[in-house]
Amino acid sequence: MAKNIGLNVAVPEKDCDDVNCPFHGSLPVRGQVITGKVVSERMQGTVVVERNFLHKVQKYDRYEKRSSKIHAHMAPCLNAKIGDEVKIAECRPLNKTTSYVVVEVIKE
């Protein structure tokens, strides 16, 4: 039985026994909710999500494209592949570089 995590996301159909799963484990989510594209899934249980945004250059009063890469934990009940659009939510630090968890696969 999946629990309500407080976000407007679809609950995954598969069950998992991961303690760091926001739906089936005991990991609370809070803070930022970001959408981005998966660019790497080579780490075990972790994906790299690239987020694109616009940054204003004050001198020229114009915008430039920038991007940042965020490491996010992916539970076994969610199956995201490279190129998928995912929604990630902030959580407590899980390791040195991971403070986000994948909560929904938007577009495959």
UniProtKB/Swiss-Prot annotation:
<keyword id="KW-0694">RNA-binding</keyword>
<keyword id="KW-0689">Ribosomal protein</keyword>
<dbReference type="GO" id="GO:0006412">
    <property type="term" value="P:translation"/>
</dbReference>
<dbReference type="Pfam" id="PF00366">
    <property type="entry name" value="Ribosomal_S17"/>
</dbReference>
<keyword id="KW-0699">rRNA-binding</keyword>
<dbReference type="InterPro" id="IPR019978">
    <property type="entry name" value="Ribosomal_uS17_archaeal"/>
</dbReference>
<keyword id="KW-0687">Ribonucleoprotein</keyword>
<dbReference type="InterPro" id="IPR028333">
    <property type="entry name" value="Ribosomal_uS17_arc/euk"/>
</dbReference>
<comment type="function">
    <text>One of the primary rRNA binding proteins, it binds specifically to the 5'-end of 16S ribosomal RNA.</text>
</comment>
<dbReference type="GO" id="GO:0003735">
    <property type="term" value="F:structural constituent of ribosome"/>
</dbReference>
<dbReference type="InterPro" id="IPR000266">
    <property type="entry name" value="Ribosomal_uS17"/>
</dbReference>
<dbReference type="InterPro" id="IPR012340">
    <property type="entry name" value="NA-bd_OB-fold"/>
</dbReference>
<dbReference type="GO" id="GO:0019843">
    <property type="term" value="F:rRNA binding"/>
</dbReference>
<protein>
    <recommendedName>
        <fullName>Small ribosomal subunit protein uS17</fullName>
    </recommendedName>
</protein>
<dbReference type="GO" id="GO:0022627">
    <property type="term" value="C:cytosolic small ribosomal subunit"/>
</dbReference>
<comment type="subunit">
    <text>Part of the 30S ribosomal subunit.</text>
</comment>
<comment type="similarity">
    <text>Belongs to the universal ribosomal protein uS17 family.</text>
</comment>
